[in-house]
Amino acid sequence: LLQGIALSSRAQEQQMWQRYHDKCRREASIIDTLPSKLEKALHWSPTINKEQKEVIRYILWNMVYVEGGTANLGDNNNYPVDVASFFINRYEVSQDEWYVIMGENPSNQHRRNYPVDQVNWFNAQRFTQKLSQLSGLPFRLPFEAEWEYAARGGLKTKNFIYAGSNNAEQVAWFREKYYNTYVSKETGTKKPNELGLYD
């Protein structure tokens, strides 16, 4: 199973995490300039460490407000659903974020800003529960209707075939086009949809 995988040295791994933390620190510092409402809403756990705090601030900075509305969802757009307003992250959860919050990286190939893989719904639930425990904020997974509504662009939808474009290559990585493999790609590298959501 490990054939063809190069494991990084400890020094390389430390440099990788340092670059990631520096990036988080730079981007998370922006959130500190927002009104103190957000900071007041946070109730940091006494067990939280500095890196976890930075990651949670980074996640919050990348939350996108999705205004609620009525949409026709489902494969044939024939299932009308009322969706309340909510927030959703503009990116998939990265391996870095998962590692800092959960203390492990279950992914097959460890790559810093790639989406976490080898996790199921229960693992994802544990991740959101841990975010809530550490921050005091009510993190959760989106409901299926919320996810589809956001992927389609919410009230800003232009009714593209795919989430953000009629050309799948602009917005998605797909197996047939990329050497017939199941390799994940770095988050946020394709065009976002109408709400600014990637991947």
Regions found by a protein language model. Give the residues of each.
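Short N-terminal segments immediately surrounding and downstream of signal-peptide cleavage
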Residues: E13-E27
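Long amphipathic alpha-helical scaffold segments
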Residues: K40-I48
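Classical Sec-dependent N-terminal signal peptides that target proteins to the secretory pathway
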Residues: L1-L7
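A short glycine-rich, aromatic-capped structural motif
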Residues: K53-S107, V119-F122
